[in-house]
Amino acid sequence: MKTLLLTLVVVTIVCLDLGYTLTCLNCPEMFCGKFQICRNGEKICFKKLHQRRPLSWRYIRGCADTCPVGKPYEMIECCSTDKCNR
């Protein structure tokens, strides 16, 4: 009986997500379907749009610990919920 109880406790601990991990989209296309699980300490999802030439944008998405600072010809959006950087 003690073995069964100990086994249940171990399985419960292994299966529970004891900490919240943020999930952000991570791909260079306009319409993104790939995502990544952020590392410990990364609590921000971001989307960076970099204008390469008129009417041509490069998309960069991912996780960050703080919201990145934009450079000229860049737009940056930051958020803090799962897959919010669409």
Swiss-Prot record:
Tell me which positions the record assigns to the signal sequence: 1-21
Name the PROSITE patterns for this protein. Answer: SNAKE_TOXIN
**Changing residue 32 to S does what?**
About 3-fold increase in inhibition potency toward both muscle (Torpedo) and neuronal (alpha-7/CHRNA7) nAChR
What organism is this sequence from?
Answer: Naja kaouthia
GO (cellular component) term, any one: extracellular region
- Identification of the protein by name: Tryptophan-containing weak neurotoxin
CDD domains according to UniProt: TFP_snake_toxin
Q: Does the keyword Secreted apply?
A: yes
Key words of the record: Cardiotoxin, Disulfide bond, G-protein coupled acetylcholine receptor impairing toxin, G-protein coupled receptor impairing toxin, Neurotoxin, Postsynaptic neurotoxin, Secreted, Signal, Toxin
Q: Identify the residue position(s) of the site Important for interaction with human M1/CHRM1 and M3/CHRM3 mAChR, and muscle (Torpedo) and neuronal (alpha-7/CHRNA7) nAChR.
A: 52-53
